[in-house]
Amino acid sequence: MIRIAMVEDEAAVREQLMGYVQRYTRQYGTEFSVTEFADGMDILENYRPVYDIVFLDVEMKHLDGMETARRVRELDKDVIIVFITNMAQYAIG
């Protein structure tokens, strides 16, 4: 089972991402355990290195994704961090 932390401040986007994960599960049979966080502070509050992947929004109200990633990396050198954003300047073309 792959353990995912999903850090996204917009509930509609979290729901959309969950849909992608569920569709992947249906297509490929891979099982996921997803824990949702609405803010960078939420995941950092009691962070333990139990996740395989962290999906992390770049722009959030209380603590942005870049700073959250820096702090997560201090606590967990092995977790895969995937940034998610709708901001064109951060997109890879």
Predicted regions and their residues:
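Two-component/phosphorelay signaling modules centered on CheY-like receiver
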Residues: E10-T35
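Alpha-helical elements of the RecA-like P-loop NTPase motor core of helicases
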Residues: E15, E45, I92-G93
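Short amphipathic alpha-helical segments
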Residues: M18-G19, R48, E67-T68
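CheY-like receiver
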Residues: Y51-G93
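Acidic, metal-coordinating helix/loop segments flanking the phosphotransfer/catalytic sites
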Residues: S33-I53
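Conserved SAM-binding loop
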Residues: M6, E36, F83-I84
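Non-catalytic signal-transmission and effector/linker regions of two-component phosphorelay proteins
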Residues: M1-R3
